[in-house]
Amino acid sequence: KVQQLLKDYFDGKEPNKGVNPDEAVAFGAAVQGGILSGEGGDETKDILLLDVAPLTLGIETVGGVMTKLIPRNTVIPTKKSQVFTTYQDQQTTVSIQVFEGERSLTKDCRLLGKFDLTGIAPAPRGTPQIEVTFEVDANGILNVKAEDKGTGKSEKITITNDKGRLSQEEIERMVREAEEFAEEDKKVKERIDARNSLETYVYNMKNQINDKDKLADKLESDEKEKIETATKEALEWLDDNQSAEKEDYEEKLKEVEAVCNPIITAVYQRSGGAPGGGSSEEEEEEDGHDEL
C-alpha cells in the first residue's frame, strides 16, 4: 500500500526497490548515532536527521481535558512551558498527570505517568501560578517538571520510551480515532470550556469583592449584596446542573455578567481606574490560566 501511495504521489513513477530494507535501517541508525555522539566527522556534518514526537504530549486539567503542550510531529529535542493555576480555594497540592494522544479528553488518551506537587501556599482559587515544563531530549526521553512560582517548590518525573512503547500501528490507530471522533470531541470540550468559564468568572467575582486590594473597599453595601446573591445563585445552579449543555452555561454566564459588570463599571468610573488597582489586561492574564 505504501509503495502504491508513493507511486501515485510521484505521478506514476516506480519506487526504487534496489535497497535492502534491513540495511537501510542499520545504515540510518549508524548515521543517527554518529550525529548524536558528535563522532560522525565530515561524513555526517551536512546530514540532518529529524526525529519527531509521534503523539501529542500534555496534562489533564479541570474537566478531564487534555491540555496539549507538545503537539504531534514536533521536532525533538524540544522544550515547552505553560503556567497553570489551582481549581479550589486554599488548595495546597496539585496532581500532574501526563498523557499522550490526540483526543480532547484524557480518558481517550494514554497515561504516561503522574506526580503531585505539594506545599503550595494556601490562596484563593486561581491565584497560585504553577509552571509546568515538558522537555523531550534527542533520545525521546520526556522530563516533566512542575514548579510553584510563589514558593519555588518543584517536583519532576522522567518518562523513558523503552517501557510500554506504542507500536506504529497503535499510534496510527490513535490518530485515526482522533480524526473519526473530532466533531464529537469538539462538542464535549466546548461544553466543558463553557462550564469552566462560568465557574472561573463566578469565583473571580467572589474573590474580588472580598479582596481589599481589588473591590472590597470600593463597593457600596447594596452593590456587594447584589454580586454576592448573583454568584451564590450561580454556584447553586452549577451544583444542580452538572450535565447542562454548552448553551445553558453560556446563558447563565450572561445572566451573572448582567448583574456584575454594570457594578464593576460603576466602581471603575468612581475610582478613575481599573478595579483592583491594575490594568484589565493584567487581570485577564492572571485569570487566564488553565486549572489543575
Curated annotation (Swiss-Prot):
GO cellular component terms, A-Z: endoplasmic reticulum lumen
Glycosylated residues, chain numbering: N241
Keyword Glycoprotein: yes
Motif (Prevents secretion from ER): 289-292
Subcellular location(s) of the protein: Endoplasmic reticulum lumen
Pfam families reported for this sequence: HSP70
Region (Disordered): 268-292
Keywords: ATP-binding, Endoplasmic reticulum, Glycoprotein, Nucleotide-binding
Gene3D superfamilies per record: 1.20.1270.10, 3.30.420.40, Substrate Binding Domain Of DNAk, Chain A, domain 1
Top-rank taxon: Eukaryota
Ranges annotated as biased composition (Acidic residues): 280-292
Molecular-function annotations in GO: ATP binding; ATP-dependent protein folding chaperone
InterPro entries named in the record: ATPase_NBD (IPR043129), HSP70_C_sf (IPR029048), HSP70_peptide-bd_sf (IPR029047), Hsp_70_fam (IPR013126)
UniProt keyword Ribosomal protein present: no
Family: Belongs to the heat shock protein 70 family.
Chain's role: Probably plays a role in facilitating the assembly of multimeric protein complexes inside the ER.
The protein's name: Luminal-binding protein 2
Source organism of this protein record: Nicotiana tabacum
Gene designation: BIP2
